[in-house]
Amino acid sequence: MARAVGIDLGTTNSCIATLEGGEPTVIVNAEGARTTPSVVAFSKSGEILVGEVAKRQAVTNVDRTISSVKRHMGSDWTVDIDGKKWTPQEISAQILMKLKRDAEAYLGEPVTDAVITCPAYFNDAQRQATKDAGKIAGLNVLRIINEPTAAALAYGLEKGKEDERILVFDLGGGTFDVSLLEIGKDDDGFSTIQVQATNGDNHLGGDDWDQKIIDWLVSEVKNKYGVDLSKDKIALQRLKEAAEQAKKELSSSTSTSISMQYLAMTPDGTPVHLDETLTRAHFEEMTSDLLGRCRTPFNNVLHDAGISVSDIDHVVLVGGSTRMPAVKELVKELTGGKEANQSVNPDEVVAVGAAVQSGVIKGDRKDVLLIDVTPLSLGIETKGGIMTKLIDRNTAIPTKRSEVFSTAEDNQPSVLIQVYQGEREFARDNKPLGTFELTGIAPAPRGVPQIEVTFDIDANGIVHVSAKDKGTGKEQSMTITGGSGLPKDEIDRMVKEAEAHEAEDKKRKEDAETRNQAEAFAYSTEKLVNDNKDKLSDDIVKEVTDKVNALKEALKGDDTEKVKTAQTELMTAAQKIGQVLYAQQGAEGAAAGADGAGASAGSASGSDDDTVEAEVVDDDDDKDNK
């Protein structure tokens, strides 16, 4: 049976885990690391690179390297590579395919089922895009679950039997969430994890802290050299890598040096060098506004849950950005001096929780119940542009809610159902999720027809909406996919393309291996001929040398089949060398044996006159004779 996995599809890094004997295990990737950079690159030859190898070549291939694509999920953003427009779903699918391949190599069996995490504050379009990315990657997405919920799931399983409230503070590379959860265990060890409230900011994360350093460095260079690096893509990529490294170093040191040579050239040809020292105090000062943006979601969660800071039992930090000392201090301040729990790895805990949830869904774990919530209110636009909410935020999911509406005009033949997600009073200020029309309403004065609108949110947090005219029984429904949603045929096309790319990559790898083997064989055969020229006939030397040259010529081209043919012909010719060398070796051995046998026979059959009589003398006799 195929294995199920849990995947944390992150902005900066991604992680994959599975259950081994009922316990979660993080899967090491092909490079030997426990997390994989969420970076995808397209080489000039058309090869798709993912992870560390893509990240390493970013400076020399800026326009064809994509990072932090998670920030574009649920939008209509695309990137043009060689005339093909790639969507965020397709780029994310490449990351998922890499994780899937590495997991299959690690486990030695197929991986088809996955629970994929997303930020708790992702809206419907972003969740649908995440699910689509999984489909394109060839995964059966069992569930989309919220990252803080997954983290609490991993953390909560280690706790005792007492009921506890856990606050999860999740600051990743590109998104920020705060969730409050209640965890309880009964006497049989059955855990119930219920989300009480969640809030966040989908455009706040470690990337923004990096950008502050980049902006500062650009400003320093401009002041010193008069050169604006903000238009230089290669210089910016180098600054980005330096900024990320500086941020990490300032988590453990009070200052760091940023030194970069030959970043650019001034108009008069002077090279631009960078040598700056950034202190932690200066870094915290320049990023104080970002830190301030973390306060509102925290306060909103406490307000929505109706609790005070003193009701929080534990604080769990998730996401690499929570390693920054200023973030830890902020959490401590907000929670009234509570020290955050250090028992979980902030980079891995989300994937671990997702793996546990995959086990729950597949029936491998029967000791956990997870109850999540919808992060944003859902409603429709009614007369006057009002946002009429049918499902309030922080409602436990799955859930279903219906409400009856009517027409605004006499004899109105149809109604346009416009679905929105958000907390603002007017529909236009919220996120539009989709629109559909219910037609065929029987003529009647306004206010008479009864139109029942039903919202159904599944366990993935994805919305299904239907509208029914109670008078005629006519019904219209849709699954919300948002403005960026992909129709099924488009997803199917992308799945086929992704499979084709995977097949292409596999063939490219096989071709490279074939060429390497052929090159090595040509070299070793040529050496064998040169080392044994004196033992080989001119005909064999010429035949093999010609075949070696033919193989070398084939290797200069791109036709792998031609290389294979040339290698096969060389192997056939090279066999003659072996036959000659072994034959000569056998002949020499036979000759040596014949010489030895002749000597023995001569001694035995000679005449008596030729026989030498001898006696053995001891040492004393020998001495006397001397």
UniProtKB/Swiss-Prot annotation:
PROSITE patterns in the record: HSP70_1, HSP70_2, HSP70_3
Single GO MF annotation: ATP-dependent protein folding chaperone
SUPFAM superfamilies given in the database record: Actin-like ATPase domain, Heat shock protein 70kD (HSP70), C-terminal subdomain, Heat shock protein 70kD (HSP70), peptide-binding domain
Origin superkingdom: Bacteria
InterPro entries to which the protein is assigned, alphabetical: ATPase_NBD, Chaperone_DnaK, Heat_shock_70_CS, HSP70_C_sf, HSP70_peptide-bd_sf, Hsp_70_fam
Keyword field: ATP-binding, Chaperone, Nucleotide-binding, Phosphoprotein, Stress response
Segments of skewed composition (Acidic residues): 607-626
Region: Disordered, residue numbers: 586-626
Compositional bias segments (type: Low complexity): 586-606
Sequence positions bearing Phosphothreonine: T175
Pfam families registered for this protein in UniProt: HSP70
Induction remark: By stress conditions e.g. heat shock.
Summary of the function given for this chain in its UniProt record: Acts as a chaperone.
Similarity comment: family membership: Belongs to the heat shock protein 70 family.
NCBIfam families attached to this UniProt entry: PRK00290.1, prok_dnaK
Protein name as catalogued: Chaperone protein DnaK
